[in-house]
Structures are given as C-alpha cells and as structure tokens.
Amino acid sequence: SVCSYCDFSNNNPPADMAKWEKIQINATTMDKFCCNNNIMPDFIKMDIEGAEMPALEGGMKTIQECRPQLAISIYHSNEDFINIPLYLNKNLKNYHFKLGHYSPWRSETVLYAIPQEIKF
C-alpha cells in the first residue's frame, strides 16, 4: 500500500497534494490482524473514505465469529449505498439492520448491523 503524508506546518494548502511525500507501508486484513493479536472485537466502526467494502471483505471471518455490532459508513459512493447492505445481509446471519442519516445532504449515512442476541 502507499500512504501519503502532508505537512501543513508551512501553511501548505491541500492543493499541494502533488508534492506530498509517498511512503510504502505494510497493510493487513482485519482477519489477519485480529487472529495474530488475539483480538475479539465487539464493536467495529468504519468511515474509511470508500474503502469500507474491501475492509469488510478482509474482516468477514472475524465479524462472523465474534458477532460485533457494526457502524459502517455507506455514503462514499452510490454503489456502497446498495452493495454494503446487500453484502452484510448475505454474509451475516441473525443481524438487525438500521440506517442512520446525520446530514441534510447525501453524506453521513451509516448502516448499523446489530446481532439479534443484543436487545435494543
């Protein structure tokens, strides 16, 4: 993966993104990270600027085994608004789904997935 870093200390505006230094970083999936570190999440929140679907795909085994509550942003693309709920509904058994919308515009729509064993 490639990660960009921006130094705003010299009042560089975001338009200077072409000048950002590019560095290589190691990345992993949620499944590998949780397994390697013996982590059993009970709540997962994702607002990762359109990377929610690949993150969910890389964490589905953990989500299925640990059954955490989820709060997943789905507003970054029209496809996410449709595909993320369909993907979760297909892959998660006995979950309730709810939408939360926190803006008068298209942004800030969150899909909540709550295991049925959790009463709300």
Task: Describe the role of every protein-language-model region.
Residues 1-120:
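Phosphate/nucleotide-binding beta-alpha loop and adjacent structural elements of enzyme active sites
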